[in-house]
Structures are given as structure tokens and as C-alpha cells.
Swiss-Prot record:
Keywords: DNA-binding, Metal-binding, Nucleus, Repeat, Transcription, Transcription regulation, Zinc, Zinc-finger. Residues 11-82 form the KRAB domain. It is found in: Nucleus. Its main location: nucleus. It comes from Homo sapiens. GO terms for cellular component: nucleoplasm; nucleus. This is Zinc finger protein 789. InterPro entries: KRAB, KRAB_dom_sf, Krueppel_C2H2_ZnFinger, Znf_C2H2_sf, Znf_C2H2_type. GO terms for molecular function: DNA-binding transcription factor activity, RNA polymerase II-specific; RNA polymerase II cis-regulatory region sequence-specific DNA binding; zinc ion binding.
Length: 425
């Protein structure tokens, strides 16, 4: 048996209509107004096609003529049912008739057919409204169900404003896709362009679609390799304005030579040439003692201190000297920090945990560093370096006074003691 149906005469257009105040109407853009007009007219046409009999509402007459003044003159939502206004010349509403059992069955059958037609109509409406969630939050049909309850059987009221807070936020700026209100006019205008299907630009090279023309023009420079932004000082051209702005800082800081790889600027061309070797991996500076190569001359000079044995960096606390400043800084932590790291084997304390770990290798006999020539292992890396001199035969430690060379640093230090008291002529 088909579900009971509600009589067509009991359902009027006012049940599916929606009205606005003057203030609410002013907050809608043209795209939203057109959408509202299409939905109301389609609701009315569907009800007529489905056999609902009632006079043509004045609202539909005004919408067909697209006269905006109707929204300001028609009665408010709260008392619109009492008005019952209709277009001039329309017939009065049909009175209810008492149906016979046969007529009741016919009405039930027709109602079931109507529900199928309404479902198809609702799916078409849903396709039009799915992009405007904030404008139409609930737009679907309620179909007849079994039981004594009569379903409304048609498109429910457009829920433009769900609650009072939502209405306030709508007037201030409406919502984004996540349901959050826009708090900036620029974001709102960008959102409205989407709602009104603003014109988009498609790249003919890669097919990418870009909404704004400025972004589209900037994107096309990637394909055509255009550099329209030129520096007036040196003539160098750039693809983007932001890159030109960064480049201008080189001239303002009196650093006209800029590295194209990292953007760093230099005062002299020689500095730029030396810097570029970092990117090209070029190492033209070679140590004459160990043949190790370097990309910068300053790095070579720091390296040569190892061979000369010179220790210019001296600790003011204990007088110990070091060849590198970084080594001195590590040493000074011994004086500035308490020796909180204590060896459990011998009780010796250290200021750094890394020193304690190295010290513990003496007790554990662990040997992590292996010689590639003979396979011998060592607990400390410095011991491995001293051992490798045996295989290479190099004598990296040279006396600057007599020119004699030594394999071991300890031998070099002992030799320098023989020159004490000598005065250079």
C-alpha cells in the first residue's frame, strides 16, 4: 500500500518561499540575488507542474518582471501567510473536499508518483546550489514515509540564516569554505569572484588555469623566459619584481657584485670570483705539504698552521696555546664550566661529556679508528693520523729557521728547543 499523502490544497507556495528585509537584501551580491530568483521561480513552476492549485503569488509576478522593489514592499516572513496576496486576476484558493476511499487511493498513488518527480527536481536544484553552501545550507526534499505522519513532500524552506549569530556574521562579511567569517574586505571580494564565476585565464603552454590576470602574466614569463624587470644601475634583468627589489639592496649597500646562485653581494669583483668557487666546487689552492686543496686562500692559510706548528691562540687562564681559534673556544669551556662529568673508573672529572667519552676508551680499550693501509686500529683519531705518516712518508712539520722537516709534531717541538737563544741576522 502506498503511503498516505497530504492533500495538494493544504500546501501553498508560502510554505516554500523565503523573504528578506531591506537590510538583508542589501547584503546580497548580484550572483546571490539571481540564484534566489531562479530558485523561487523553479519552486513555483514545479508546484504548478505537480498539480498544486493556488492563485499565482504576487511575489512570482514581481520576480518575473525582476523588480527589486518587491522585496521591500511585500509583508515580512512572520505574517506572510496571513496576507494571502495574489496577482490581479488570479483565482481564489480551492476549498478542501472530503475524499471517498477510491479518491483517497488515487491521491495516494499520485502522491507517490509526485515524490519521484520531486526527487529528480531536487537533484537538479542541488547541482545549482552546491557551490553556495553559505547561501543555501539546506535544500533537499522530504519524501513520503510509512506511518500516520504526512510528509511535506516538497522543497523545504531555504535556510539562509541558521541562527542569530550566523545572521550577524553574514552581515559583517559572510563565510569562507570552512564556515569561518571573512574579516577582511579583500578576502570577501576574492570569494565573491568565485561565486559569480569570475573570468579565469588558461595557459596555452601547460594548460594551467589562473584566476587573476596579474598572476597569469607572471606565470607566462616562465615559458617565454622574459625578464621585464631591469636594474637601472647595472642593467641586469630579472623575471620577477621581488628579485629586482632584492638586487637593488646591493647598490644601496655599495655591494654591486651579486652571486646569481645564492644572491649574496660583494663590494669587489675578486671577492665574488672567490665566492663562486663554493658553488662550482673548484679548489685551486693546494697545500705544498700535504697536497690538500681548498676553494679559498684564507682556508689554506688556516690549514697551513697545522704544518708550521704555530699556536697564536693562547688561553688566558692556563697559558695553553692552540693553532685554531675554534679549538681555544672549546678549551675555555673547561674553565668556565664545572667538571660535572666524572669517570666511574678512575674518578677523573671533565667539563664536557664528549671529553669523558673519549677518556673512557682508555679503560674500555675500544678502538674505532682503523688504518686503511695495514688495518691497525686506534682509540683516538689523532693517533691514527700520527700512524699514517709512516705509510705516506711525509714530513709535514718544517722548521722555519733551518728548514729541517719532521714526521712527528713532538720531534718538531724538541728540535725548536735547539734554536733557543739564536738571533736571526
Amino acid at each position: 500500500m502506498f503511503p498516505p499523502a497530504r492533500g495538494k490544497e493544504l500546501l501553498s507556495f508560502e510554505d516554500v518561499a523565503m523573504y528578506f528585509t531591506r537590510e538583508e537584501w542589501g547584503h546580497l551580491n548580484w550572483g546571490q540575488k539571481d540564484l534566489y530568483r531562479d530558485v523561487m521561480l523553479e519552486n513555483y513552476r514545479n508546484m504548478v507542474l505537480l498539480g498544486f492549485q493556488f492563485p499565482k503569488p504576487e511575489m512570482i509576478c514581481q520576480l518575473e518582471n525582476w523588480d527589486e522593489q518587491w522585496i521591500l514592499d511585500l509583508p515580512r516572513t512572520g505574517n506572510r501567510k496571513a496576507s494571502g496576496s495574489a496577482c490581479p486576476g488570479s483565482e481564489a484558493r480551492h476549498k478542501m473536499k472530503k475524499l471517498t476511499p477510491k479518491q483517497k487511493f488515487s491521491e495516494d498513488l499520485e502522491s507517490y508518483k509526485i515524490s519521484v518527480v520531486m526527487q529528480e527536481s531536487a537533484e537538479k536544484l542541488s547541482e545549482k546550489l552546491h557551490k553556495c553552501k553559505e547561501f543555501v545550507d539546506s535544500c533537499r526534499l522530504t519524501f513520503p514515509t510509512s506511518g500516520d505522519e504526512y510528509s511535506r513532500g516538497f522543497l523545504q524552506n531555504l535556510n539562509l540564516i541558521q541562527d542569530q549569530n550566523a545572521q550577524t556574521r553574514w552581515k559583517q562579511g559572510r563565510y569562507d569554505e570552512d564556515g569561518k567569517p571573512f574579516n577582511q574586505r579583500s578576502l570577501l571580494l576574492g570569494h565573491e569572484r568565485i561565486l559569480t564565476r569570475a573570468k579565469s585565464y588558461e595557459c596555452s603552454e601547460c594548460g594551467k588555469v589562473i584566476r587573476r590576470k596579474a598572476w597569469f602574466d607572471q606565470h607566462q614569463r616562465i615559458h617565454f623566459l622574459e625578464n621585464p624587470f631591469e636594474c637601472k644601475v647595472c642593467g641586469q634583468a630579472f623575471r620577477q619584481r621581488s628579485a629586482l627589489t632584492v638586487h637593488k639592496q646591493c647598490h644601496l649597500q655599495n655591494k654591486p657584485y651579486r652571486c646569481h646562485d645564492c644572491g649574496k653581494c660583494f663590494r669587489q669583483l675578486a671577492y665574488l670570483v672567490e665566492h663562486k668557487r663554493i658553488h662550482t666546487k673548484e679548489k685551486p689552492y693546494k697545500c705544498s705539504k700535504c697536497e690538500k686543496t681548498f676553494s679559498q686562500n684564507s682556508t689554506l692559510i688556516r690549514h697551513q698552521v697545522i704544518h708550521s706548528g704555530e699556536k697564536r691562540h693562547k688561553c688566558l687562564e692556563c697559558g695553553k696555546a692552540f693553532g685554531r681559534h675554534s679549538t681555544l673556544l672549546c678549551h675555555q669551556q673547561i674553565h668556565s664550566k664545572p667538571n660535572t662529568h666524572k669517570c666511574s673508573e678512575c674518578g677523573q672529572s671533565f667539563g664536557r661529556n664528549v671529553d669523558l667519552i673519549q677518556h673512557q676508551r682508555i679503560h674500555t680499550k675500544e678502538e674505532f679508528f682503523q688504518c686503511g693501509e695495514c688495518g691497525k686500529t686506534f682509540s683516538f683519531k689523532r693517533n691514527l693520523f700520527r700512524h699514517q705518516v709512516i705509510h705516506t712518508g711525509s714530513q709535514p712539520y718544517q722548521c722555519v729557521i733551518c728548514g729541517k722537516s719532521f714526521k712527528w709534531h713532538t720531534s718538531f717541538i724538541k728540535h725548536q728547543g735547539t734554536h733557543k737563544g739564536q738571533i736571526s741576522t
